[in-house]
Curated annotation (Swiss-Prot):
Record domain KARI C-terminal knotted: where: 182-327
Catalytic activity reported: (2R)-2,3-dihydroxy-3-methylbutanoate + NADP(+) = (2S)-2-acetolactate + NADPH + H(+); (2R,3R)-2,3-dihydroxy-3-methylpentanoate + NADP(+) = (S)-2-ethyl-2-hydroxy-3-oxobutanoate + NADPH + H(+)
Entry GO terms, CC: cytosol
Domain of life: Bacteria
Record-listed Mg(2+) 1 binding positions: 190, 194
A GO MF term: magnesium ion binding
Pathway per the UniProt entry: Amino-acid biosynthesis; L-isoleucine biosynthesis; L-isoleucine from 2-oxobutanoate: step 2/4; Amino-acid biosynthesis; L-valine biosynthesis; L-valine from pyruvate: step 2/4
Protein name: Ketol-acid reductoisomerase (NADP(+))
Its job: Involved in the biosynthesis of branched-chain amino acids (BCAA). Catalyzes an alkyl-migration followed by a ketol-acid reduction of (S)-2-acetolactate (S2AL) to yield (R)-2,3-dihydroxy-isovalerate. In the isomerase reaction, S2AL is rearranged via a Mg-dependent methyl migration to produce 3-hydroxy-3-methyl-2-ketobutyrate (HMKB). In the reductase reaction, this 2-ketoacid undergoes a metal-dependent reduction by NADPH to yield (R)-2,3-dihydroxy-isovalerate.
Residue positions binding NADP(+): 25-28, 48, 52, 82-85, 133
KARI N-terminal Rossmann domain location: 2-181
Keyword Magnesium: yes
Length: 340
């Protein structure tokens, strides 16, 4: 069973007198910074000049260049997109990592795949709330919290785990529960979930369903509602009470269709494909491809992204959403939000 820590298990005193630098002020960055500050922690923000700098300053933080913030801080939490972290780390953070400092992440990708190799003289931990930044902040303000993960990659001082837990407590996660994990487990399961289920699997399933109906002569508008729009209704039920509550809430006809058709859509071959995807993640094949894609300035990523925007599902969806002002597009930073 997983080891879970709550507020009463954690001594936040290990952070007393220390300065925490939040590097990045996006989806997760603004939430971490404000939550820790409201918990009584000394917090500064490290950024490059731009809108985020102005926003952090407006929110009352002392804002510095990344290198200056890293120099001033005892604990440095990097909350930048994965693809930007290695360069920023190498040029602006690593030179300021004196012995005994702490380097922190909310996603283990760059450490696990050796894109960031910290010196042996610093602590390295992961503190990852399992929710988007706006929810991390809102639940904290409401007196609750989003569950989180915590892991130690390197313990140079003997206090890395205590510091990681204290950070998670101050961010509100220990109000709900903090699960101990490893950088490897967090990274590999996070990538697998995104690729096989949450993003890759779901978007491919929705498109295939839409295309099947349209190719059979049904109106694209009706196909959109049945295959994409109503997905939220089902996912919300699953989110609230698992598959059991979803099945309790739908009609018996829908539930019987679930039992009969589901195994025909997701077959043994589908599960084998999932295992192959997991293998690509575990061996580093996926990471290598993504790193090379970024080094080449993302030609394939950009081409696929543009093609997908013009899929008939997207075209009809944009038209239908104009009929539904109650449907508002949310900002990026939900799945993989720790990267922002």
């Amino acid at each position: 069973m997983a080891k879970v820590f709550y507020n009463g298990d954690i001594n936040e005193g290990v952070l007393q007198g220390k300065t925490v630098a939040i590097i990045g002020y996006g989806s997760q960055g603004h939430a971490h910074a404000q939550n820790l500050r409201d918990s009584g922690q000394e917090v500064i923000v490290g950024l490059r000049p731009g809108k985020s700098w102005d926003k952090a300053a407006e929110d009352g933080f002392q804002v510095y260049s990344v290198r200056e913030a890293a120099s001033r801080a005892d604990v440095i939490m990097i909350l930048l997109p994965d693809e930007h972290q290695p360069t920023v780390y190498k040029n602006e953070i690593e030179p300021e990592l004196s012995e005994g400092k702490t380097l922190a992440f909310a996603h283990g990708f760059n450490v696990h795949f050796n894109q960031i190799v910290p010196p042996a003289t610093v602590d390295v931990f992961l503190a990852a709330p399992k929710g988007p930044g706006h929810l991390v902040r809102r639940t904290y303000v409401d007196g609750a919290g989003v569950p989180g993960l915590v892991a130690v990659y390197q313990d140079a001082t003997g206090q890395a785990k205590d510091i990681a837990l204290a950070y998670s407590k101050m961010n509100g996660s220990a109000r709900a529960g903090v699960i101990e994990t490893t950088f490897q487990e967090e990274t590999e399961t996070d990538l697998f979930g995104e690729q096989a289920v949450l993003c890759g699997g779901t978007s491919a399933l929705v498109k295939a369903g839409f295309e099947t109906l349209v190719e059979a002569g049904y109106q694209p508008e009706v196909a959109y509602f049945e295959c994409l729009h109503e997905l939220k209704l089902i996912v919300d039920l699953m989110y609230e009470g698992g598959l059991e509550y979803m099945r309790y809430s739908i009609s018996d006809t829908a539930q019987w269709g679930d039992f009969q058709a589901g195994p025909r859509v997701v077959t043994a071959e589908t599960k084998q494909a999932m295992k192959d995807i997991l293998s690509d993640i575990q061996t580093g094949k996926f990471a290598k491809g993504w790193i090379l894609e970024n080094q080449a300035n993302r030609p394939e990523f950009t081409a696929i992204n543009e093609r997908e925007k013009n899929h008939p599902l997207e075209v009809v969806g944009r038209e239908l959403r104009e009929m539904m002002p109650f449907v508002k597009a949310k900002s990026k930073g939900v799945v993989g939000s720790a990267k922002n």
